[in-house]
UniProtKB/Swiss-Prot annotation:
It is a peripheral membrane protein. The gene is atpA. GO terms for molecular function: ATP binding; ATP hydrolysis activity; proton-transporting ATP synthase activity, rotational mechanism; proton-transporting ATPase activity, rotational mechanism. SMART domains: AAA. The keyword Translocase applies. It catalyses: ATP + H2O + 4 H(+)(in) = ADP + phosphate + 5 H(+)(out). Its main location: membrane. It is an enzyme of class 7 (translocase). This is A-type ATP synthase subunit A. GO terms for biological process: proton motive force-driven plasma membrane ATP synthesis. CDD domains: ATP-synt_V_A-type_alpha_C, ATP-synt_V_A-type_alpha_N, V_A-ATPase_A. Belongs to the ATPase alpha/beta chains family. Pfam families: ATP-synt_ab, ATP-synt_ab_N, ATP-synt_ab_Xtn, ATP-synt_VA_C.
Length: 585
């Protein structure tokens, strides 16, 4: 038990704290606010408090809990909404109304709810960390696998029969090699700053299909990959994150609203229960865990929310699921680090951020990956991390963006100019990149189309050529261009408007499956080949621009039937043949 000697914003200094350890959770003051020790000097402890510290004064008690900041992992995580330190917001609302009272806690997993447990092991079986004890149908989409905690191994001496149990009831007893008995419940705790162990990492060879054409075709992310979405205000970071949370083919989505506006989390809460998962037809909320740590919540908890989210994601990965984690936005987390570092009077680095910013960001993104899990029957699971970065004024040379780019393999650069032109998703195809293309192209070739990479590279080359031509057009006007280059501008406009642009609010266009993406690309590239042939055969470019099929190509993104889109290839060819006849080419 210690006493407060100093309070500065979210930081509290207490003395008489001998015997405490780093990152231990403490209760601060008469109100019992939750805090975490982040520095120890002699018997003094520096504590970052995860709640508003107004009204606390020197002399009040500080009590250690003996455990580090941990999350509860078990049935009940899905469909829940937590704050940054895994307090269930719905439960807190029942306890204190719309405004959360300070010092309030509630168990993260519901203690009174009974779950239907079906054992998969029997007495006498040998188990190690990561083995599955049994399964619980948590939602209609996800079957929750009850895992042996990583530190336990031994022989099952008792296992619960199939039936309904709460998370607090003992469902198994394991005799460890030293003869002691470990009681296992449906949940276990895990410290958030420690990454969960696995057997080994696998190369990222399977793409995370998002249903967004720009991303899947040009700048793919692999399952277990890392991506950053930097962009200025209003360029569509949050809507892009929402689209990925809705439609990506991950089985579980963890969405962290870290220091962003509260209304954006409200949007997710309003929309997700109504939206249907394209694969199962069930509400999307049934595969989602939300962590809300909005801009009006205490700054210190932003740091915790990032770690809480990634630990929950790793837990579902250990069950053999593909998990997508959205962090919106990591800039606010970095700003929280900057504020706490300033209060600790540490030497500032670039733009006032702490010198350890780069290693903190790397540590977070390194917890992504596709892995073989622990256990006697290894499974494959993955955590893909997609972090939004909001640099002030859209300046990509800012430290958070630069340090993030060193670590992540995919960069989706959002562009304010594109957003102003109402071109969404506003991902700038000239500045963005993906380093996963070589490793995932085999999957595309095997499962979708053997010419995927060739078509993607052709389209990319056309878009780059367009950027060069646009500069010439700005100086001398479009009429000075030769016919071939005028024709390229017609095709690239189709690529931009009919392929890259996508309507997140249209029922059909919000999600574009891989087969449809490839068919659409084939239609446009076929038009390009025929256009070049027509120009070489002397057909005027103006005539090509007037072809009626162009309007149909413009509407194909709203057409759910792939065969109807494929039919546009024949229609294009017929209309070009008529042009050739007309001009005797």
């Amino acid at each position: 038990m210690g006493r407060i000697i100093r309070v500065t914003g979210p930081l509290v200094v207490a003395d008489g704290m001998k015997g405490s350890k780093m990152y231990e959770v403490v209760r601060v003051g008469e109100m019992g606010l939750i805090g975490e020790i982040i520095r120890l000097e002699g018997d003094k402890a520096v504590i970052q408090v995860y709640e508003e510290t107004a009204g606390i004064r020197p002399g009040e008690p500080v009590e250690g809990t003996g455990s580090s900041l941990s999350v509860e992992l078990g049935p009940g995580l899905l469909t829940s909404m937590y704050d940054g330190i895994q307090r269930p917001l719905e439960k807190l609302r029942e306890l204190s109304g719309d405004f959360i009272a300070r010092g309030l806690t509630a168990p993260a997993l519901p203690r009174d709810k009974k779950w239907h447990f079906t054992p998969t092991v029997k007495v006498g079986d040998k188990v190690t960390g990561g083995d599955i004890l049994g399964v619980v149908p948590e939602t209609s989409i996800i079957e929750h696998k009850i895992l042996v905690p990583p530190w336990v191994e031994g022989e099952i001496v008792e296992i619960a029969e199939e039936g309904d149990y709460t998370v607090e009831e003992v469902i198994a007893k394991v005799k460890k090699p030293d003869g002691s008995i470990e009681e296992l419940k449906m949940y276990h705790k895990w410290p958030v700053r420690v990454k969960r162990p696995y057997k080994n990492k696998l190369p990222p060879e399977v793409p995370l299909i998002t249903g967004q054409r720009t991303i899947d075709t040009f700048f793919s992310i692999a399952k277990g990959g890392t991506a950053a979405i930097p962009g200025p205000f209003g360029s569509g970071k949050t809507v892009t994150q929402h689209q990925l949370a809705k439609w990506s083919d991950a089985q579980v989505v963890v969405y962290i609203g870290c220091g962003e506006r509260g209304n954006e989390m409200t949007d997710v809460l309003e929309e997700f229960p109504k939206l249907k998962d394209p694969k199962t037809g069930k509400p999307l909320m049934e595969r989602t865990v939300l962590i809300a740590n909005t801009s009006n919540m205490p700054v210190a908890a932003r740091e915790a929310s990032i770690y809480t989210g990634i630990t929950i994601a790793e837990y579902f990965r250990d069950q053999g699921y593909d998990v997508a984690l959205m962090a919106d936005s990591t800039s606010r987390w970095a700003e929280a680090l900057r504020e706490i570092s300033g209060r600790l009077e540490e030497m500032p680095g670039e733009e006032g951020y702490p010198a350890y910013l780069a290693s903190k960001i790397a540590e977070f993104y390194e917890r992504a990956g596709r892995v073989v899990t622990l256990g006697s029957e290894p499974r494959v699971g993955s955590v893909s991390v997609i972090g939004a970065v909001s640099p002030p004024g859209g300046d990509f040379s800012e430290p958070v963006v630069q340090n993030t780019l060193r670590v992540v393999k995919v960069f989706w650069a959002l562009d304010a100019d594109l957003a102003r032109r109402r071109h969404f998703p506003a991902i700038n195809w000239l500045r963005s990149y993906s380093l996963y293309l070589d490793s995932i192209q085999d999957w595309w070739h095997k499962n979708v189309d053997p010419e995927w990479r060739k078509m993607r590279d052709t389209a990319m080359a056309l878009l780059q050529k367009e950027a060069e031509l646009q500069e010439i057009v700005r100086i001398v006007g479009p009429d000075a261009l030769p016919d071939r280059e005028k024709a390229i501008l017609i095709v690239t406009r189709m690529l931009r408007e009919d392929y890259l642009q996508q309507d997140a609010f249209d029922e059909v266009d919000t999600y574009c499956p891989p087969k449809k993406q490839v068919t659409m690309m084939r239609v446009i590239l076929n038009f390009y080949e025929r256009t070049m042939e027509a120009v070489d055969r002397g057909v005027p470019v103006d005539e090509i621009a007037k072809l009626p099929v162009r309007e149909k190509i413009g509407r194909m993104k709203f057409e759910p039937d792939i065969e109807k889109i494929r039919a546009l290839i024949d229609e294009t060819n017929e209309q070009f043949e008529e042009l050739f006849k007309k001009y005797g080419a």
